[in-house]
Amino acid sequence: MSVAGLKKQFYKASQLVSEKVGGAEGTKLDDDFREMEKKVDITSKAVAEVLVRTIEYLQPNPASRAKLTMLNTVSKIRGQVKNPGYPQSEGLLGECMVRHGKELGGESNFGDALLDAGESMKRLAEVKDSLDIEVKQNFIDPLQNLCDKDLKEIQHHLKKLEGRRLDFDYKKKRQGKIPDEELRQALEKFEESKEVAETSMHNLLETDIEQVSQLSALVDAQLDYHRQAVQILEELADKLKRRVREASSRPRREFKPRPQEPFELGELEQPNGGFPCASAPKITASSSFRSGDKPTRTPSKSMPPLDQPSCKALYDFEPENDGELGFREGDLITLTNQIDENWYEGMLHGQSGFFPLSYVQVLVPLPQ
């Protein structure tokens, strides 16, 4: 920095201290300017929070959002073009229904109904994905651009204006000790910065119809999503009602138990036949995947000591996305990298991928 630049920084710092500590009066900006500055500040805060809340509306699970961010980061590191999408709850429900519907088979009314409902839920997930894309393109991206460009530029102009005001007030306070030409130049720069900042704020506030159009695009995308969702659910409701009518009209099959096979008294006694009924998991608002949650631990095999970064699997881990490394309890995994505080990258059976830290016990840590 030049000597002139250092002097200017000293002038501004000195004036700021005299105003904050000594109570000195600085040059006051007019009320219209202050009113515009206030409106721009409110607009900036509104846009920032609306962006955050819109993303939460589209992708409500914070753990899934964090995991998706991590997966996208890993994809960029590996040079992968296709990034995994957000796991829509409708899609997860649909996959569950389809899987169990197939297990029950075509002879089960409930199984057929689960297949119908599952396919409809998967269609709802596809429509929700389309909503995400539409809202991102026509609402989130334009608002983000407003934050990154226009509002950021206004903040730059206001910061520059404040610096020139401090420089002008310092020189004005020392009028007579500082050359008149230097004071005149400081005043011109201050007025120039004020005009630039004022113009940029005025342009933003006068063109807020653009933000209204973007908000309208958000509502249009929501309407389109809900129309398609209603159509899918109405079709599903008709299918299920038809299945109820068909099942009710069929005669009930009579059940005739088969006689028990004779057995010798010397044979081992067996418990009565039956089938286990798995208890339904308790659903809570926070039952989605969390990096800190740990399943119930079952005893695992002891492993020999190692001389390279490695860990032992405490629980089974089923990969849900490309790039994840699946393993079974007791598997010994070689550690190659730590993605973040919740995820490792490692190798097992010649395959590389990443996995949650909470599913393993580190035996030999990675070098710092």
From Swiss-Prot:
Q: What is this protein called?
A: Endophilin-A2
Q: What does this protein do?
A: Implicated in endocytosis. May recruit other proteins to membranes with high curvature.
Q: Per the UniProt entry, what species is this protein from, by scientific name?
A: Rattus norvegicus
Alphabetical UniProt keywords: Cell junction, Cell projection, Coiled coil, Cytoplasm, Endocytosis, Endosome, Lipid-binding, Membrane, Phosphoprotein, SH3 domain
Region feature Membrane-binding amphipathic helix, mapped onto this chain: 1-21
For whether the record's keyword set contains Coiled coil, the answer is yes
Instruction: Give the location in the cell.
Output: Cytoplasm; Early endosome membrane; Cell projection, Podosome
UniProt-annotated stretches for the region Required for dimerization upon membrane association: 60-87
